[in-house]
């Protein structure tokens, strides 16, 4: 009979929620105030997800362009969680701003109203990003993650679709907090979160005592896909195959070391599909099309993010201090620098 898995706790911000009043994290007791959706005129559909439909809209009281996320029938508890988290994070660095919570007067369907971001589809955008652009946007995303983690919240669905980028304005926002959750040490969480290609090994081996470091794996997957121009970087056909794809890069011996450390029992199905794989060098993924985006610092950062052992991954704050970001920090610390001009490289061209 397999024994219980070993306990684990976040290396940072572990006690944030226990130091706050219950009202901060007890989302089930939260009572959102719902305004009237009639103030918002839907303009066009932007997309749909598992839990919502998203529209561009106009606030007819002030002509402001907004995004309205109409929530599909889902447990009230989940809606309360998303609203409470968005309210707690309001005003945070690079976090999408919740403007209003409204209900359709007839159907009573709840909807969330957000600031509008003129996003470029990542499949097009990632093809044109320069080395500096990648460093810049990854740094901006880390600011958002360090902010939410410092507030005791794990995003749990970091992926390109949830990172809005207005490339003209060099503006990034982390969106879709529908899977986000409050971190409490030793709590066991649902592993059915995040999107397949961005799921950390802890989710794939059914280890429930995870923490903020889950988001750092997902960010590592994004970084890998950007610098190597391979989208997605780990391309599994299903959740089982996803771990196999990871093992083919990080190695099977290293995986077994991770499982042993945390007393994790692997699903027997893996016996048939995992095989034996050596750890690959990150340099193996460099080719003529991506060489200009890869540097020793990029590979070093990547190596410190894509670790099986969630406790070994860099935290968001540690990642921001990595040499890979020195050029960005240098630019952002320049007084009165026009970041948009600098980062587009126009100054160099003059």
Curated annotation (Swiss-Prot):
Which Gene3D superfamilies does the entry mention? Phosphorylase Kinase, domain 1, Transferase(Phosphotransferase) domain 1
Q: Listed GO cellular component terms?
A: cytosol; nucleus; protein kinase CK2 complex
Where do the Protein kinase domain residues begin and end? 40-325
**PTM annotation (Phosphotyrosine): residues:** 13
Q: What quaternary arrangement does the UniProt entry report? A: Heterotetramer composed of two catalytic subunits (alpha chain and/or alpha' chain) and two regulatory subunits (beta chains). The tetramer can exist as a combination of 2 alpha/2 beta, 2 alpha'/2 beta or 1 alpha/1 alpha'/2 beta subunits. Also part of a CK2-SPT16-SSRP1 complex composed of SSRP1, SUPT16H, CSNK2A1, CSNK2A2 and CSNK2B, which forms following UV irradiation. Interacts with RNPS1. Interacts with CSNK2A2IP (via C-terminus). Interacts with SIRT6; preventing CSNK2A2 localization to the nucleus. Interacts with HIRIP3.
Family, as annotated:
Belongs to the protein kinase superfamily. Ser/Thr protein kinase family. CK2 subfamily.
Which sites bind ATP?
46-54, 69
Q: Which residues participate directly in catalysis?
A: 157
Q: Which PANTHER family match?
A: CASEIN KINASE II SUBUNIT ALPHA
Q: What is the protein name stated in its UniProt record?
A: Casein kinase II subunit alpha'
Q: What class of enzyme is it?
A: transferase
Q: Which reaction does it catalyse?
A: L-seryl-[protein] + ATP = O-phospho-L-seryl-[protein] + ADP + H(+); L-threonyl-[protein] + ATP = O-phospho-L-threonyl-[protein] + ADP + H(+)
Q: Which domain of life is it from?
A: Eukaryota
InterPro entries linked: CK2_alpha, Kinase-like_dom_sf, Prot_kinase_dom, Protein_kinase_ATP_BS, Ser/Thr_kinase_AS
Identify the gene encoding this protein.
CSNK2A2
Q: What else is known?
A: Can use both ATP and GTP as phosphoryl donors. Phosphorylation by casein kinase 2 has been estimated to represent up to one quarter of the eukaryotic phosphoproteome.
Positions bearing N6-acetyllysine: 97
């Amino acid at each position: 009979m397999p024994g219980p898995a070993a306990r684990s706790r976040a290396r940072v911000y572990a006690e944030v929620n226990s130091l706050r009043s219950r009202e901060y994290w007890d989302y089930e007791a939260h009572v959102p105030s719902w305004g009237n959706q009639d103030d918002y005129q839907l303009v066009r559909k932007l997309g749909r997800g598992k839990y919502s439909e998203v529209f561009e809209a106009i606030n007819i009281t002030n002509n402001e362009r907004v995004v309205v996320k109409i929530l599909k029938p889902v447990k009230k508890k989940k809606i309360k969680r998303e609203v409470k988290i968005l309210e707690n994070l309001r005003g945070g660095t690079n976090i999408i701003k919740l403007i209003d919570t409204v209900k359709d007067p007839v159907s009573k369907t709840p909807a969330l109203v957000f600031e509008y971001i003129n996003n470029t589809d990542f499949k097009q955008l990632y093809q044109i990003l320069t080395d500096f652009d990648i460093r810049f946007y990854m740094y901006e995303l880390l600011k958002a993650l360090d902010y939410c983690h410092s507030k005791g919240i794990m995003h749990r669905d970091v992926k390109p679709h949830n990172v809005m980028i207005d490339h003209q304005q060099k503006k990034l926002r982390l969106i879709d907090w529908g899977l986000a959750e409050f971190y409490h040490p030793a709590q066991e969480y649902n592993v059915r979160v995040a999107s397949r290609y961005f799921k950390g090994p802890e989710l794939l081996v059914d280890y429930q005592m995870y923490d903020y470091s889950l988001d750092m794996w997902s960010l590592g997957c994004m970084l890998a896909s950007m610098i190597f121009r391979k989208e997605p970087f780990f391309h599994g056909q299903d959740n089982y195959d996803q771990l196999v794809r990871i093992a083919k890069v990080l190695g099977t011996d290293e995986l077994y070391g991770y499982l042993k450390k945390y007393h994790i029992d692997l699903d027997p199905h893996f016996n048939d599909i995992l095989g034996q794989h050596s750890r690959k060098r990150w340099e193996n993924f460099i080719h003529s099309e991506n060489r200009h985006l890869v540097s020793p610092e990029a590979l070093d950062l990547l190596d410190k993010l894509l670790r099986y052992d969630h406790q070994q991954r860099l935290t968001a704050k540690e990642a921001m201090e990595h040499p890979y970001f020195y050029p960005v920090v240098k630019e952002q610390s320049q007084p009165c620098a026009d970041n948009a001009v600098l980062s587009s490289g126009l100054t160099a061209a003059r």
